[in-house]
Design a protein with these regions (language model features):
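Arg/Lys-rich, positively charged N-terminal/basic patches that mediate binding to nucleic acids
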Residues: 1-37
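PIN-domain endoribonuclease scaffold, especially VapC-family toxins
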Residues: 5, 33-43, 62-69
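Enriched for short, Lys/Arg-rich terminal
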Residues: 25, 70-74, 78-103
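Basic/aromatic recognition patch in beta-strand/loop cores that engages polyanionic ligands
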Residues: 51-82
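Residue-level detector of alpha-helical recognition elements and their boundaries
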Residues: 25, 29-32, 36, 53, ...
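Short, solvent-exposed helix-to-loop capping segments enriched in aromatics
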Residues: 42-53
Length: 103
């Protein structure tokens, strides 16, 4: 079993997603639903961190990222086998060009 860690940017991303859906789209029920889905998906990585293949970018990155679709959002994470840890780096709108956000 792996520990799951959220980087501050990932937490900020998730808060912004939930607030946007609740306030801008006037749909607090949908906001609560996506918050639950994001939390459940993050926790599922404890047991199945390799559920998705590694993301192959055009340029070299510091980490071997994996991406997991959660409704309309992409959860970007990497796995540290030595530390038995999954680090969730970002959560972004799936149609966004997220390659610029990764290091």
């Amino acid at each position: 079993m792996y520990n799951v860690e959220y980087l501050p940017l990932a937490v900020q991303d998730m808060v912004e997603i939930v607030v946007y859906i609740a306030r801008n789209l006037y749909n607090p029920a949908a906001a609560e639903h996506i918050a639950d889905q994001l939390a459940e998906t993050g926790e599922s990585l404890r047991d199945f961190p390799y559920v998705q293949p590694a993301y192959t970018p055009l340029r070299p990155l510091k980490h071997e990222y994996r991406k997991l679709l959660v409704e309309n959002y992409m959860m970007l994470y990497w796995v540290s086998e030595t530390e038995k840890r999954v680090t969730i780096a970002r959560v972004v709108y799936a149609r966004r060009n997220y390659t610029k956000l990764l290091e």
